[in-house]
From Swiss-Prot:
Its EC number is 3.5.1.5. It comes from the Bacteria. Keywords: Cytoplasm, Hydrolase. The lineage of its organism: Bacteria, Pseudomonadati, Pseudomonadota, Betaproteobacteria, Burkholderiales. Heterotrimer of UreA (gamma), UreB (beta) and UreC (alpha) subunits. Three heterotrimers associate to form the active enzyme. This is Urease subunit gamma. HAMAP family: Urease_gamma (MF_00739). Signal peptide: none annotated. It catalyses: urea + 2 H2O + H(+) = hydrogencarbonate + 2 NH4(+). Pathway: Nitrogen metabolism; urea degradation; CO(2) and NH(3) from urea (urease route): step 1/1. It is an enzyme of class 3 (hydrolase). The keyword Hydrolase applies.
Length: 100
C-alpha cells in the first residue's frame, strides 16, 4: 500500500487519538501529545461528517475540559490548526483556546 505523506500523518494522528481515547476512558489525564491528537482527530472527523467550518471550530472547544488533561496542558495549547477535508474541499480550521 502506497500512502502520501499527508495520509501517513492522518494515520499517525488517528493512532495517537485512539490511544488517548482509551486512556481517557480509563480515567487517566491526557498529556500534551495525547490532547492535541484527540482534538485534532475529532476535528478531522467532524469535517468529514459534513459539519461547517464554524461548527467544527465550536465543536473543538467542547471536547475536553481542564479535568481531562494534566496540569499545565491547557496553557500549552493556545490554539490548534488543522487542515481538514470537508465535502467541498480542504480548509484550514483554527480552534482558539480548545480547553476552556
Amino acid at each position: 500500500m502506497k500512502l502520501t505523506p499527508r495520509e501517513k500523518d492522518k494515520l499517525l494522528i488517528f493512532t495517537a487519538a485512539l490511544l488517548a481515547e482509551r486512556r481517557r476512558a480509563r480515567g487517566l489525564k491526557l498529556n500534551y501529545p495525547e490532547t492535541v491528537a484527540f482534538i485534532t482527530a475529532a476535528l478531522m472527523e467532524a469535517a468529514r461528517d459534513g459539519r461547517t467550518v464554524a461548527e467544527v471550530m465550536h465543536y473543538g472547544t467542547t471536547l475536553l475540559t481542564r479535568d481531562d488533561v494534566m496540569e499545565g496542558v491547557p496553557e500549552m495549547i493556545p490554539d490548534i490548526q488543522v487542515e481538514a477535508t470537508f465535502p467541498d474541499g480542504t480548509k484550514l480550521v483554527t480552534v482558539h483556546h480548545p480547553i476552556p
